[in-house]
A protein has these predicted regions:
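Beta-lactam-recognizing serine transpeptidase/beta-lactamase-like catalytic domain environment
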Residues: 1-183
Length: 183
């Protein structure tokens, strides 16, 4: 558990959580549900620690880039259009863990990331095509989903991530009334 006080003051300048009063004690499920800045700042800080209490910006950024690479965020998706090269944050380590770094991702790169989360680790080569047909309607080529990589982590961890994401949908009213089951 991590105790969100509302202000992450392990770095200078301090970083405020969106909920200024603090969320209190959080596990990862609740941190995802509440999108707690403090929680994810602490993860970035802890992953950058060397020794007892010394923080290494470089180590923290290296860890972020390592994990981003596992889920395919450091490479193009493979879609049949020109695509910008993704960039995983290389500055401001701690705020980067809550998405406030200098990341650069296209919509398709973020869609692939969401698919990795939803499929418990399948990193797909994306395609916009289902099939190509000639003028007579005959299929020339069909495109099947292609798994480029698999993130091998415990199913328990995927369950925790999925539960946290499900809680986002079930807890917040912005998703009410859509007429479809979202999660």
């Amino acid at each position: 558990y991590i105790e969100c006080t509302g202000t992450f003051d392990y770095v200078d300048p301090p970083i405020n959580c969106w909920y200024k009063n603090g969320h209190g004690s959080l596990d990862i499920r609740t941190a995802i549900e509440q999108s707690c800045n403090y929680f994810f700042n602490m993860i970035g800080f802890q992953l950058g620690k060397v020794g007892d209490n010394e923080f290494s910006e470089v180590q923290s950024l290296n860890k972020l880039q390592e994990y981003a690479s596992l889920i395919g965020l450091d490479r193009k998706t493979g879609i049949e259009l020109s695509e910008a090269t993704p960039k995983v944050s290389d500055a401001k380590a701690v705020p980067s863990y809550m998405g406030q770094g200098n990341n650069l991702f296209t919509t398709s790169e973020l869609a692939r990331y969401a698919t990795v989360m939803a499929t418990s680790g399948n990193v797909f080569k994306l395609t916009l095509l289902d099939k190509v047909m000639d003028p007579k309607g005959e299929v020339i080529q069909e495109y099947e989903p292609e798994i480029e990589d698999v993130v091998n982590i415990s199913s328990n961890i995927w369950d925790v991530i999925h539960d946290g994401m499900r809680r986002v949908i079930q807890t917040h009213s912005q998703f009410d009334g859509l007429g479809v089951e979202v999660a």
